[in-house]
Amino acid sequence: MSIYDDIFKQFPTIDEWSESNEKIMLEPYTHLGINTAKELPSMVTKAFNHWYQVPQPALDIILQIVGPIHAACLLIDDIQDDSDLRGGNPVAHKVYGVAQTINTATYVCFDAYHKISKLTPFSKSPETTDLWSIINDEIAALHRGQWIDLYWRDSLICPTEEEYLRMIHNKTGAIFRLPIKLLQALSPVDSPPDCFPLVNVVGILVQIRNDLLSLSPDFTKDKGFCEDFSEGKFSFPIIHSVKADSSNSLLIDILRLRPKDEPTKRKALRYMKDQTKSLDHTFDVLCKLEKTAKEELEKLGGNSELSSILELIQVSPIPEIADR
């Protein structure tokens, strides 16, 4: 008897989804090998709950939302940047292919998205419209920021520092704001403090810190040597260097080439360090941002857990990063 003799009987079987299928489908995601609970967005979320006092079960669900979304973004970022390494290992799409990795990243995002409904019992009202709006708005902001970053890269348009800050306010800031907004929406505290100036500063601080660390020997082990040059990316130090001397096209020419060889990238790095002092400038900006974050934290009455995180992400002096 053919399965087509009574096709309707086949639907339940066709719709079944086994644990083995799920495990295989998630392999590009698990390949990342990251503990989402120890990633910065999750750590920051737990620290900010000091002010919002959301019950642990609800906090756990929020972490189950932000962690996978952040990981999915890393999978997509690696594809869009044509990266080779993450955490010292081959990136997922080099192992499983671009198509499977995109599909898995999308699936992980939707799976996290569906967890919003689990927050309903903790909501201040039976309606969860605000919760859906939060995730919709911040995911949209993330994609807008990512788009303009890619647009600058692919069009070889160097933004101003102000434009770059607005971009990372969306792209990086969204992954920090999303869980904090969920905490705010679910908080049993009558009048929780306004933490968003601090959240936004932390997002900007983290991205510019990553931009500087991408030039360090330690980061080379994780992502390769000065990969921003190979990716043609306008990072914060590169933007400063290009704008510092618009008559010198060295960096633009190197970004256009997207070099893989170390000598070319070392030449660009030395120019940024010695000629335009862009690493010094970036370090100075990070120090100002750290100071601002600590001042905001003090205004909010302090938070030992968040203070520890700020100490953890504090940048090293320039000589330890660039002299080699």
Curated annotation (Swiss-Prot):
Gene Ontology terms for molecular function: lyase activity; metal ion binding; prenyltransferase activity
UniProt: Mg(2+) 2 binding residues: D77, D81
Pfam (any one): polyprenyl_synt
Class in the EC hierarchy, top level: lyase
Cystine pairings recorded for this chain: none
Superkingdom in the source lineage: Eukaryota
The reaction(s) this protein catalyses: (2E)-geranyl diphosphate = (E)-beta-ocimene + diphosphate; (2E,6E)-farnesyl diphosphate = (3E,6E)-alpha-farnesene + diphosphate; (2E,6E,10E)-geranylgeranyl diphosphate = (E,E,E)-alpha-springene + diphosphate
InterPro entries xrefs: Isoprenoid_synthase_dom_sf, Polyprenyl_synt
Cofactor comment: Binds 2 Mg(2+) ions per subunit.
Annotated positions binding Mg(2+) 1: D77, D81
Enzyme Commission identifier(s): 4.2.3.106, 4.2.3.46
Cofactor(s) needed for function: Mg(2+)
Annotated keywords: Lyase, Magnesium, Metal-binding, Transferase
GO BP: isoprenoid biosynthetic process
Physiological role: Terpene synthase that shows monoterpene synthase activity and produces (E)-beta-ocimene as a major product, using geranyl diphosphate (GPP) as substrate. Also shows sesquiterpene synthase activity as it is able to convert farnesyl diphosphate (FPP) into (E,E)-alpha-farnesene. Finally, TPS2 can convert geranylgeranyl diphosphate into (E,E,E)-alpha-springene.
UniProt family annotation: Belongs to the FPP/GGPP synthase family.
Protein known as: IDS-like terpene synthase 2
